[in-house]
Design a protein with these regions (language model features):
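A structural motif corresponding to the C-terminal end of an alpha-helix
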Residues: 150-153
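A short His-aromatic
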Residues: 91, 95
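A short acidic, helix-capping loop that chelates divalent metal ions and anchors anionic groups
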Residues: 126-132
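Helix-to-beta-strand junctions that scaffold the AdoMet/dcAdoMet cofactor pocket
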Residues: 96-97, 110-114
Length: 193
């Protein structure tokens, strides 16, 4: 973190309206739509983090209200009153010192039904000079898979997608590297039984 830089504690409108974020959310929602485990509509959902435009997209897809969280995800319990058949955590764990804590808390909040799912996305590892200064972790696939297993989840399916347009790649050497390395990993996870 550079001098004077502070971490964002709430999502602001300017950040939410960024076309890159909207593209990520659309691709994430397309992945969610591909799940055959959940019967629609579901009774309730939990979106980890503040309410964003993707929360409304999830509500429209699943046909229910999605609650959001407002606790310190590194240290505090989620303290939810209900158990959810679907939980989403899109690009959250890379911002945490202790992502295992959050995954264990999500497992407690997930409904025990075999069809319940956690949809999780995070940036794929990239060289240090391309990593975001706002991220504590950009994990290699094997480390992320180990974290998921340690938290008691199994991978139902996964995918990876790029977040840059082809024209962006032609703007220079560093943009070309970003097109090659800057990818999002997304998972559909089920609690191990």
């Amino acid at each position: 973190m550079t001098r004077g830089q502070e971490f964002r504690t709430v999502v602001d409108q300017r950040w939410s309206a960024d076309p890159a974020h909207l593209m990520r959310w659309e691709k994430s929602l397309a992945f969610v739509r591909g799940s055959s485990a959940l019967s629609l509509p579901v009774s309730a959902g939990l979106d980890i983090g503040d309410r964003t435009p993707v929360t409304a997209m999830l509500e429209a897809h699943f046909g229910c209200r999605f609650e959001t969280t407002s606790v310190d995800l590194d240290t505090e319990p989620l303290d939810v009153a209900t158990r959810y058949p679907v939980v989403t955590a899109f690009e959250v764990i890379e911002h945490l010192y202790n992502p295992l804590h959050l995954l264990l808390e999500i497992r407690k909040a997930l409904d025990p039904a075999p069809s319940s799912r956690l949809f999780l996305s995070t940036p794929a590892w990239k060289p240090g000079f391309l990593q975001s200064p706002d991220h504590f972790h950009e994990m290699q696939k094997r480390l992320l898979d180990a974290l998921i297993a340690r938290a008691g989840f199994e991978v139902a399916r996964s995918s990876e997608f790029g977040i840059r347009s082809p024209l962006f790649c032609l703007r220079g050497f560093r943009p070309m590297l970003r097109c090659f390395f800057e990818k999002i990993r997304i998972y559909e996870l089920a609690a191990q039984r």
